[in-house]
Amino acid sequence: MSTWIIIAVVVVFFAWRMMPTKGVKTISTDELKNILNDKDKIFVDVRTQGEYKARGLKQFKNIPLGSDFSKLPKDKEIVVICQSGMRSKQACNQLKKLGFENVTNVRGGMSAY
């Protein structure tokens, strides 16, 4: 019986982690390709510097997760990417807590690009 409870808790935990953040728009990598040259958006890659150097998109500024996002302009849309979508989701949460209104997460990250 306790094994089933543990399994249920693990499933609920991972389901919760995968849920989109309230107030954060999610786009696919195909949608990203259509907006990459939009000068009204700020593109942020939250992977490590090494990951970014190995395979980064030139439109994205590398600001690793855990860095200070408060210097980004709050009047522009912030589009966030990472390797798989998990770190970018965390960064989107941080941006929302800092008062950013227009935040977009790229689903699947660079792995899907």
Predicted segments, located by residue:
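A generic structural signal for secondary-structure junctions
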Residues: N37, G56-L57, S111
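Short loop/helix-cap segments at secondary-structure boundaries that form the rim of catalytic
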Residues: Y52-K58, S70-K74
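A short alpha/beta connector and helix-capping loop motif
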Residues: K58-L65
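Catalytic cysteine-centered active loop of the rhodanese-like fold, especially the PTP/DSP P-loop
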Residues: S67-Y113
